[in-house]
């Protein structure tokens, strides 16, 4: 069983699966490093076997999903991949359990399709790649709650489309509360505008 090594750190689980879209979680994982010891980021897959990302990187998960104690998880992150139209039952069951207990879940691109498949978007405001993308999910009845935004947060569930990794990461940072808001704002300003003033603010806040 994988458990937290420090009682005050927050365990963030990034789901590792074949064809996971590298750009969708890159800003997120790098940005979490700014939180230092406040965050422990682990990758977890259906098994601990190596997966290949969409960009061709070989990732060996830190753990299998079965090795995790759901009570230890502070956030579950579901990246996009080419395979979300079916399967992934183990991680989707975990997502449903976490949502029921109030633990935040963050899904981007294909990950939102997974949430739609298990009903987690039926009553929450959400976004994705497009409304008809989520329409591929059997049983999805949440179309009235779809919002054409870069990222949406509602009732503990963060959703974003494939082209919004920055907004996705920002929403995760804010939900975790592991970084001061001025740091998040400076980080977001830097990567959306490239302006020096945000870099100076970010460095000055560290």
Question: In which residue ranges do the predicted regions lie?
Answer:
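Charged, often glycine-rich, active-site loop that binds/positions anionic groups
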Residues: 55-61
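Active-site-adjacent pocket-lining segments in enzyme domains
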Residues: 2-20, 30-47, 62-106, 110-206
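Acidic surface patches and DE-rich sequence motifs
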Residues: 52-53, 128
């Amino acid at each position: 069983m994988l458990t937290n090594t420090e009682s005050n750190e927050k365990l963030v689980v990034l789901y590792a699966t074949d064809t996971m879209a590298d750009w969708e979680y890159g800003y997120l994982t790098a940005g979490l490093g700014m939180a230092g010891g406040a965050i422990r980021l682990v990758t977890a897959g259906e098994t601990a076997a190596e997966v290949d990302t969409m960009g061709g990187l070989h990732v060996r998960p830190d753990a299998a999903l079965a090795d995790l104690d759901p009570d230890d998880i502070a956030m579950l992150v579901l990246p996009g991949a080419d395979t979300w139209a079916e399967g992934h039952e183990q991680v989707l069951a975990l997502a449903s359990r976490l949502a029921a207990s109030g633990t935040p879940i963050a899904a981007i691109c294909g990950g939102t399709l997974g949430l739609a498949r298990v009903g987690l978007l039926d009553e929450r405001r959400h976004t994705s790649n497009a409304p008809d993308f989520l329409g591929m999910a059997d049983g999805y009845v949440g179309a009235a709650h779809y919002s054409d935004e870069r990222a949406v947060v509602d009732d503990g569930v963060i959703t974003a489309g494939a082209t919004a990794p920055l907004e996705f990461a920002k929403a995760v940072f804010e939900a975790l509360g592991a970084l001061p808001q001025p740091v998040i704002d400076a980080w977001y300003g830097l990567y959306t505008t490239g302006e020096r003033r945000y870099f100076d603010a970010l460095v000055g806040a560290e």
